[in-house]
Design a protein with these regions (language model features):
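A hydrophobic transmembrane-helix motif
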Residues: 1-27
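Cytosolic ends of transmembrane helices, especially the final helix of ABC transmembrane type-1 domains
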Residues: 34-63
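ABC ATPase nucleotide-binding domain helical subdomain, centered on the C-loop/LSGGQ "ABC signature"
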Residues: 76, 136-138, 171-208, 252-253, ...
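C-terminal portion of ABC ATPase nucleotide-binding domains
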Residues: 78, 253, 275-315
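The feature captures the beta-strand-to-loop junction immediately N-terminal to the Walker
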Residues: 113-115
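Helix-to-loop junction immediately C-terminal to a conserved catalytic motif
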Residues: 127-129
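Conserved ABC transporter NBD signature motif
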Residues: 132-143, 152
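A short, proline-enriched helix->beta-strand linker immediately N-terminal to the Walker B motif
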Residues: 228-232
Length: 315
């Protein structure tokens, strides 16, 4: 814009433009144009800033409301998990699987496995009610989706395959503000010896996201926290993926003891412990098969092949 003013204004001063300007007239016009151009650009930026502020305010306004009092969470007790005709998937897409029926009792460990992207983790998250599911999930006759978030918090414990750790100490990460001694749970996940060898022991800070721990240590610490809070329904999504077979076998024995009052859903692609599970869910090609390990080996060739392939691996 300034270049055009200089060009055409110069022609007017020289008498070859559409009119004749004096130097004073040209200088005045150029100064006014510069001022207006500067103010106009600031006005555009101000308009954009106001528009962004309005959008941001709409987003945060619900968060500015008074938070309702959080009721005390009681873990309670669950005797029976019933799943009927369960369908899971992402909204708008073909379901990952459908027709899952399962009945499990307190003290049982249920394995979930299948090929990649068959819906194992999606099934685990269905117990959190993060997205709608078809069919029914009932705990002692109560539909999970109809419970309040606080009630579900007291009933369901979830451990994802990416451990979520806080930047506090090992003790704080296990107890989450509760009192007590976390060593029994650290012992159950074979982490007690490593913690004892640390200079600050239980007061060792793990760093944001557990960056000061190895992958296996972070995974075991998150599992210790899940076991410490003893929810009636435990969802463990691939909790042994960063561990060797010997450590996994030892932790599984402790899991049986510490989770004796819970129903455990164990999601894993490693099957050598599955013969010890009470039931197994096999997900593949949109279908769900449920049975004991022996039953699935006999009637599901893909499950049998995957188990045989892993059985030959050395620990």
């Amino acid at each position: 814009g300034a270049a055009l003013i200089l060009y055409f204004g110069g022609k007017n001063v020289l008498g070859t433009g559409w009119t004749v300007w004096s130097i004073a007239e040209f200088t005045t016009f150029l100064a006014c144009f510069t001022k207006l151009a500067t103010k106009s650009s600031k006005a555009a930026k101000l308009f954009n800033a106001v528009h962004k502020a309005q959008v941001s305010w709409k987003r945060i306004q619900p968060l500015m409301r008074e938070i309702p009092a959080v009721p005390a969470v009681s873990a309670g007790r669950v005797e029976r998990l019933e799943i009927r005709d369960l369908t899971c998937g992402y909204p708008g897409d073909t379901p990952l699987f459908s027709g899952l029926d399962l009945t499990a009792c307190r003290g049982q460990i249920i394995g979930v496995t299948g090929p990649v992207a068959c819906g194992k983790s999606t099934l685990g998250k269905a117990f959190l009610c993060e997205q709608p599911y078809g069919g029914s999930i009932r705990l002692d006759g109560r539909e999970l989706a109809e419970l309040s978030p606080w009630e579900r918090t007291g009933l369901v414990g979830y451990l994802g395959h990416d451990p979520e750790l806080f930047s506090g100490t090992i003790r704080e990460n296990v107890l989450l503000g509760d009192t007590g001694d976390p060593m029994d749970y650290l012992r159950a996940v074979c982490l007690d010896g490593e913690v004892a060898a640390m200079t600050e022991g239980l007061e060792t800070r793990v760093g944001t996201g557990g960056v000061r721990l190895s992958g296996g240590q972070a995974q075991r610490l998150a599992l210790a926290r899940t076991l410490a809070h003893q929810r009636p329904l435990l969802i463990l999504d691939d909790p042994f993926s960063a561990l060797d077979r010997a450590t996994e076998t030892e932790i599984f024995a402790h899991l049986r003891r510490l989770a004796a009052d819970s129903v455990v859903i164990l999601i894993s692609h490693r099957l050598y412990l599955f013969p010890e599970l009470d039931q197994v869910i096999w997900l593949e090609n949109g279908e769900a098969k449920v049975g004991t390990h022996e039953e699935l080996v006999g009637n599901t060739p893909d499950y049998a092949a995957q188990f045989d392939a892993q059985r030959g691996e050395q620990p």
